[in-house]
Amino acid sequence: MKALFRACRIGKVMLRYRLDTLLDGTAVERWLRLAKPFVPRISAEIVEQSRGRRLRLALQELGPIFVKFGQILSTRRDLVPQDIGDELVMLQDRVEPFEGQTARSIIETALGKSVESAFAHFDTVPLASASISQVHAATLHDRRAVVVKVLRPDIEHQISDDIALLKSLATLVEHTHPNADKIRPREIVAEIETTLAAELDLQREGANASVLRRFWEASDDIYVPEVIWSHTAERVLTLERMYGIPSDDIALLDASGIDRKALSSKGIRVFYTQVFRDNFFHADAHSGNIWVDSDPARKSNPRFIVLDFGIMGQLSQKDQYYLAENFMAIFHKDYRRIAELHVEAGWIPPHVRIEELEAAARSVCEPYFTRPLSQISLAEVMMKLFHVARRYQLTLQPQLILLQKTLLNIEGVGRQLDPELDIWVVARPVLERILRARYSPRHALKELNKRLPEIMTHAPDTPRLIHTWLVQQVESRKQNDVYLQQIRALAMTLQGLQRRVVNAIVGSGLLVAAAVLYGLHPDGLYLGTIPVWSLISGCIGALALFSAWWRS
């Protein structure tokens, strides 16, 4: 019953924001139309809004889980139209905070001790509040300033109920929407469920932060706050407290004397290093999660501070290689290579003609190369390439789509800091250097050395495994020979049967012809009372039937 009321409310909100137009021509749209008399009249202000804005406003009204749904949907640019995707990016994950005393209770249950014994001071008024968690300031007994991230009470059940409802809606859309095969609603909901499940485990988020910190511990480019593991559990995450300037606060950055040009180039370099050197990249890199160190000593060599580690990305080695090669092919305007790489990577079926893909890649990339370098976006090029490739049954792993969205965010942050940022000039040497190092003989020897214990462990078994493999090959060949003989015998049997069938058909036909000729008494030679042609047909027909019977 609760789910029914929730579904009714969703339908009511959809109608209020005229989202029924997104379902035109479907069974759902017809049912929604029946409910229109029970919904207040739509204001002229809403009618004048774009469909993307109407969807964004509706999701905000439906609550925090649907806001999170919209945010995740905005990352799937391969599935949603550009106008809707651009609007969903602007969704703000801000909700009313829950009681500070409730947060204290959750912390005490998770850590197994009182707040007073865990912290010297704990501020019950949150610093920030979002759909899944909220953050409180605190001080440890050793006087270190920290922030404590606490999951909302009963959030798991709320998410479970809303996910179940979304699954039902996705199934309905899949069966009624004419473009369901392109939208793939159940795939979207499954991805949302996976992402939310990861964000509900704060210990996992702490592990992500710890790994990223280890990669960049000695770097002047980014700083990752330390995880306080003694004060971290599945529902509570305690991190070193950071102070900085949001990367989109241009006025404050300028007032602090930060070199924005150096900062923007550094952001691009850091991203490509995370993807191709570390294979562990921050996948929620919007300006709210990227701050700038406000230390006056770092004005000329600014440093990023990274926050929120719930969504991290990793690529398979295969996708890493093909993505890097794609970037290099774009840099060199090698459209043939771009097409070949899409097929070799398995993103596009092998039956698609390379020439068609090459022409499609050229039509996407060439218009970008006519622009000033400061206006070229590598993320946009990749997004357009993938969008065009959908016509050729493009299949991408979710992590690649996540990377595409992250690259778009990183370029956006970089262009905010420096509108004249030349992403190609910054990215190309970094990518070339990383690829040279990654595929160098030294790196190959390093990887070999890393796997040497495994190789040495299995080395004694190698002769036995080779012998077993050779025996299998010999046995397989013998078995194949037997199968081949059986197939040949079967083929000969079928050929004989085919000849007998033909003889029987011919014989029967000739006997019928003989009987017809005998009955018609045609002009010509007769042997007694039998026409000669009838006699010849009968004899040949009888021989053919006897041949078919004798062979059987």
Curated annotation (Swiss-Prot):
Enzyme Commission number(s) from the entry: 2.7.-.-
Entry keywords, A to Z: ATP-binding, Cell inner membrane, Cell membrane, Kinase, Membrane, Nucleotide-binding, Transferase, Transmembrane, Transmembrane helix, Ubiquinone biosynthesis
Transmembrane portions of the chain: 501-521, 530-550
List of residues binding ATP: 127-135, 149
SUPFAM superfamilies xref list: Protein kinase-like (PK-like) (SSF56112)
Location relative to the cell: Cell inner membrane
UniProt record, GO biological process: regulation of ubiquinone biosynthetic process; ubiquinone biosynthetic process
CDD domains attached to this UniProt entry: UbiB
Protein name, entry field: Probable protein kinase UbiB
Species this protein is from: Xylella fastidiosa (strain Temecula1 / ATCC 700964)
The gene coding this protein: ubiB
